[in-house]
């Protein structure tokens, strides 16, 4: 089946090689290692994977990248609700770096030098409980 908006076969899209983040992460660690509080590769745990690595904070993701047509097709064909989709799939967000906001522009520039789009997708706030909020084009989801 074709992903119409991309004019490519869905199977080829799913099986296309995944980018390795090793070179860009190595470059980021050269200058920012001591500023990084955490890193999460969102494959194998989706957008909720961060919950395995935090305690008593509220992770808020409210500036997500636009959703890829592939994930829209998967959701439509499977009938999976969007909350579950964000739990299972990375939704196009593959790597997260948790660090103070004042260093984000440096890291974004490094990513861009490797031709990788990057941006601040959210923030972490103090909380009495571990919590994740995803505010996306597909809805507001609490985990």
Task: Give the residues covered by each predicted segment.
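Glycine-/charge-enriched secondary-structure boundary and capping motifs
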Residues: 4-15, 19-143
């Amino acid at each position: 089946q074709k992903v119409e908006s991309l004019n490519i076969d869905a199977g080829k899209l799913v099986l296309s090689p995944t980018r390795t983040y090793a070179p860009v992460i190595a470059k980021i660690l050269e200058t920012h290692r001591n500023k990084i509080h955490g890193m999460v590769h969102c494959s194998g745990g989706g957008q909720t994977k961060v919950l395995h690595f935090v305690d008593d904070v509220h992770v808020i993701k409210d500036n997500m990248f636009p959703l890829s047509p592939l994930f829209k097709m998967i959701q439509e064909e499977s009938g999976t609700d969007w909350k579950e989709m964000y739990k299972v799939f990375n939704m196009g967000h593959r790597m997260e770096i948790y660090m103070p906001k004042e260093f984000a522009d440096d890291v974004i520039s490094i990513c861009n030098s490797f031709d990788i789009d990057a941006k601040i997708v959210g923030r972490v706030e103090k909380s009495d409980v571990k919590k994740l909020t995803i505010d996306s084009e597909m809805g507001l989801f609490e985990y």
